[in-house]
Amino acid sequence: PQTHEGSEGLAALFKRLSRTSPRVNIVRIFEDGDYVFAHTEYDFATSNIGFEVFRFEDGQAVEHWDNIQRRQGPNPSGHSMVDGPVEATDLSLTESNRKLVGSFVKDILIDRRLGELENYIDQERFTQHNPRIADGLSALRSALGSASSNELTIAYDRMHRLLAEGSFVLSVIEGSFGGVHSSFYDLFRISDGKLVEHWDTIEAVPPPGEWKNDNGKF
C-alpha cells in the first residue's frame, strides 16, 4: 500500500531506494502456479528481512505483495532470521503440506487450541528463526501462551493466502501485534508430516489514509 500503481509507481520507488545504495540477497525462492514467493535480505540504509510475493500472467509480473521487518537476532538458540535449508524437497507432497499448514494456522494460531500443538510440531526437532523464540515445542508453546497476556499481544484473525512448493509453505495472515493492525508472513518447512522449521516477519499495516493505492496490504 506504500507504492503507487503501475510502472510509474515502481520507478518512483526504485529512485527513492537508489539513494540508499541498496543491496538485496534472495535467500530462498519458490514457485506455486502463477505465484513466486521469495525470502530476502535487504540493506536499504537499514538491514531488513522480507518476503516478496509476485503473481504472473503471460510471463510478466502483474501483482505484488511484501512483508518487511527490521533484522533482529540471533535468537536464543543462535539462529538468524534467514539461515537454514533453502531448497524445496518432497515436491509430490505440496498439497498435503499446504493442507497441514492451513490446519495449523486455523487450529493453533487463530483458534488458539494450544493443546493440539503436538499434532503439528515435531517434538524432537523444531528449529525456530523468530528472533524472540528458542528452538523446540516447549518454547513455541510458551511463546504462544504468553502472546495473549503481555504487552506484545498477538492476535491472528484471518488467513489470506497459503503458498507452497514441496516442503515449504508460506502463510499470509492478518491480525494485530501489540494492538496494532499487522501482517504476519510465516514460512514453514515440513518433514514427515510435521512442522520442523519456522521463519517469519511481522509488519504494521499503515492506516488507509496513508495508502498510495487502493489495493490494501492483502
Residue ranges of model-derived segments:
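C-terminal and inter-domain tail/linker signature
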Residues: 1-218
